Amino acid sequence: MGDAAVHATRAAALVEGSVVMKLASLKNGSRDGKLVVVSRDLKKAVAVPQIATTMQFALDHWSSVAPALAEVYQGLNHGTVQDEFVFSEQDCESPLPRAYQWADGSAYVNHVELVRRARNSEMPPSFWTDPLMYQGGSDDFIGPRDQIEVVSTEYGIDFEGEVAVI
């Protein structure tokens, strides 16, 4: 996996002014995970419950929490933050384990053709004039290193990776 893909899966990067912060949601047994600030090199993290308990809370209150998150991020990178711990992507949830919604547009005709062929389905004639877009269920996102659970291979399940822009 290239550096860009690793960075995208390990932490969500959010911009506050000219400061790029790396934030992640750690698994903690709750439905939304626990927000942590992650160091630039992705080696250390620190929980910030005094600022925001979840990524969703941080996004919903961005204008009021971003300055404090940026300060923690700078301190973490300069070694001046207490209670830091080793960051491990295996401990991560999806950045937003339960997003309000997500939409997917199938822009790659080759991919659509391959999937249709695998299911012995014809390409719909309308595909060439009407963009294929759908809204997906976002109640069960998984973390970047979680196992993909499949009840039975008899369903002919196909899966793909998606990129989230937060």
Describe the residue ranges of each PLM region.
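Short, Lys/Arg-enriched N-terminal segments with co-localized hydrophobic residues
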Residues: 6-20
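Active-site microenvironments in enzyme catalytic cores
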Residues: 20-27, 31-32, 40-41, 49, ...
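Short beta-strand-centered aromatic/proline hotspots
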Residues: 36
